[in-house]
C-alpha cells in the first residue's frame, strides 16, 4: 500500500464567457507566464472562428466535438517484466483523455507555421472537428501503437 496520501484535486472554476469548466481548463493550459487574459482572448476568438468556419450555431458543442474527436481511448505504458520492457496497452481515464486531447491540440497549433495563434488554433479545432489534422493523427498513432502491442494486455496492472 502506498504511504502517500491522495492528491487533492484543485477545483477549476468555470470560464466567464461560456460558463464552461472544459473551456476554462483549456484556457489555463494555453496560458504562458500567468497571462490569462491573453490566453482567454486567443481561445475565445478561435472558438468564434471555429463556429464561423463550420457554420455551427452552438459554439460550445462544436468545441466539445472537436475535443472528443481527439480524445484517446487507449495508450501504451512501459512495463518491465524479467529484464524485458513491454509496451502494454491500457485504457485511459476520462480526466487524462481530456488533458491529452487539449495538450495535443495546443501543441499542434503551436507547431503550425505562419498566421496568428488564434487562426492556428481555430484551424486545429476545425481539423479536429473534421477528424483530420496533427492532433487527430497523434490520437490515431497512439491507438495504432496500442493495437500493435495488444498481445501484451495480460501484463496489465
From Swiss-Prot:
GO molecular function annotation: rRNA binding; structural constituent of ribosome; tRNA binding
Keywords: Ribonucleoprotein, Ribosomal protein, RNA-binding, rRNA-binding, tRNA-binding
UniProt xrefs under SUPFAM superfamilies: Ribosomal protein S7
Keyword Manganese: no
A GO biological process held by the record: translation
Pfam families named among the record's database cross-references: Ribosomal_S7 (PF00177)
Alphabetized InterPro entries for the sequence: Ribosomal_uS7, Ribosomal_uS7_bac/org-type, Ribosomal_uS7_CS, Ribosomal_uS7_dom, Ribosomal_uS7_dom_sf
Keyword RNA-binding belongs to the record: yes
GO cellular component, one term: small ribosomal subunit
Assembly notes: Part of the 30S ribosomal subunit. Contacts proteins S9 and S11.
Homology family: Belongs to the universal ribosomal protein uS7 family.
Reported function: One of the primary rRNA binding proteins, it binds directly to 16S rRNA where it nucleates assembly of the head domain of the 30S subunit. Is located at the subunit interface close to the decoding center, probably blocks exit of the E-site tRNA.
Record-linked PANTHER family: RIBOSOMAL PROTEIN S7
Name this polypeptide is given: Small ribosomal subunit protein uS7
Organism, as annotated: Borrelia hermsii (strain HS1 / DAH)
Amino acid at each position: 500500500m502506498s504511504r502517500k496520501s491522495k492528491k487533492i484535486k484543485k477545483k477549476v472554476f468555470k470560464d466567464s464567457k461560456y460558463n464552461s469548466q472544459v473551456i476554462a481548463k483549456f484556457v489555463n493550459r494555453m496560458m504562458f507566464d500567468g497571462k490569462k487574459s491573453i490566453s482567454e482572448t486567443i481561445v475565445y476568438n478561435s472558438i468564434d472562428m471555429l463556429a464561423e468556419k463550420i457554420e455551427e450555431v452552438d459554439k460550445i458543442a462544436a468545441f466539445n466535438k472537436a475535443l472528443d474527436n481527439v480524445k484517446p481511448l487507449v495508450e501504451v505504458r512501459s512495463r518491465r517484466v524479467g529484464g524485458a520492457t513491454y509496451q502494454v496497452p491500457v485504457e485511459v481515464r476520462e480526466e487524462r483523455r481530456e488533458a491529452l486531447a487539449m495538450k495535443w491540440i495546443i501543441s499542434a497549433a503551436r507547431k503550425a507555421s505562419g498566421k496568428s495563434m488564434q487562426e492556428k488554433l481555430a484551424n486545429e479545432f476545425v481539423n479536429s472537428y473534421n477528424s483530420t489534422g496533427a492532433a487527430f493523427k497523434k490520437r490515431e498513432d497512439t491507438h495504432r501503437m496500442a493495437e500493435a502491442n495488444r498481445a501484451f494486455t495480460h501484463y496489465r496492472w
